[in-house]
Amino acid sequence: EGFDAWILRTVTKVNPKTVPSLPEELKFIGSASAGTDHIDKEYLSHNGIQFDHSPGCNANAVAEYVLTSMLTWCSSTRGELTNHKVGIIGMGHTGVALAKKLQAIGVSYAGYDPPKALREESFRSCHLDTLKDCDILSFHLPYIDQGRYPTHHFMPDILSLSPKHKLIINAARGGIIKEDYLLRHNELIALSNKKISFILDVWETEPVPDKVLVNQAFIATPHIAGYSKQAKIQASKGVLRRLLSHFDSEWTDSKLQHKQMDSTKNKLGEASNCGFNKKTNTLILSVL
C-alpha cells in the first residue's frame, strides 16, 4: 500500500487469489517483461487499474538463444543449418527477430501466424501443411487458453509431429507443447532410431520441470532464454516510460532512484515496494 503504481516481473502473479484486495490508490501496474500471462488483466480492469508491459524487450536475446541452440544441435549431428528448413510458429517480435537472423545466414524458413495475417495485409502466414515439411520447429507464441486462436497444447491439438521433424524448440511459454506428447512419441519410435530432439527453455510445470523430460532434452534451461543484460534494461525502461506516460510525466533519469532487491524472492509485498508515488513524482526501481 501507499503506491499509485507497481512495477513487477513475471515471478509475481497478480490475480484474485494472490491479491484478493487491491489498494484503492493503485492505478497502474507495469510488468518489466514481454509476456503477460502472470497478470489477470480482466481483474485489473474491473478494479480500474491500467496494465502495461514491454513487448519485444527480450526478442533479440531469445532469438540468439534459439539460433545458437540450432547451431549446437546441427554440430552434434554433423550437419549444417543451411540444409534444414525452419518453421517459425508465431511471427511476433521474437519470431521476426529469429527470421531475420536465419535469412542473414541463408537458412530457409516458413512463418506461421494466422492472427497476424488478419491484422496486417503485408504479412502472409504459411499453411499448417508447410510446417509439417520443416525439419526444425521453433515456437514463439503467447500462451492463450481460449478464443479463436488458442495456443494451449498447440502441439498436438493443432499441429502434430510428422516424420520430417527432427528438432522441436520451445522458448516461448510452457503449455504450448504438451510435454507428455513428446515423451510418448519418442517412446513409440524408440526402436526405429528416429527420435525427435527437443530444446526446452519453458515448462508446463514451472518452476519445477518434469525430470524425465529434462533428461531427454538435447538442451534444457530454466526459462532464461531472454535473460540478457540488454533485455532487462530494455524491459525496465520500456515499462517505466509507459508508467510515466500514464501519469502525464516525462522521462528523465533524475526521476530514477535505484533500490537493490533480491530478484529471486517471489513475494508480492516485496515486489510492491518497487513503485511510483505521484505526489513526489519519484520512481523506486528494482527491476534492473
Language model features with spans:
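N-terminal glycine-/charge-rich "phosphate-binding" loop or analogous flexible N-terminal tail
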Residues: 1-5, 110
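Phosphate/diphosphate ligand-binding glycine-rich loop within oxidoreductases
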Residues: 4-78
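Rossmann-like adenosine-cofactor binding region
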Residues: 14-18, 116-211
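Phosphate-coordination loops involved in phosphoryl transfer and adenosine-cofactor binding
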Residues: 26, 82-86, 165
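Glycine-rich adenosine-cofactor-binding loop
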Residues: 55, 63, 80-103
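Oxidoreductase and adenylate-handling cofactor-binding alpha/beta cores
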Residues: 63-79, 104-107, 238-245
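NAD(P)-binding Rossmann-fold cofactor-contacting core
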Residues: 104-121
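Rossmann-like dinucleotide-binding domain for NAD(H)/NADP(H)
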Residues: 165-288
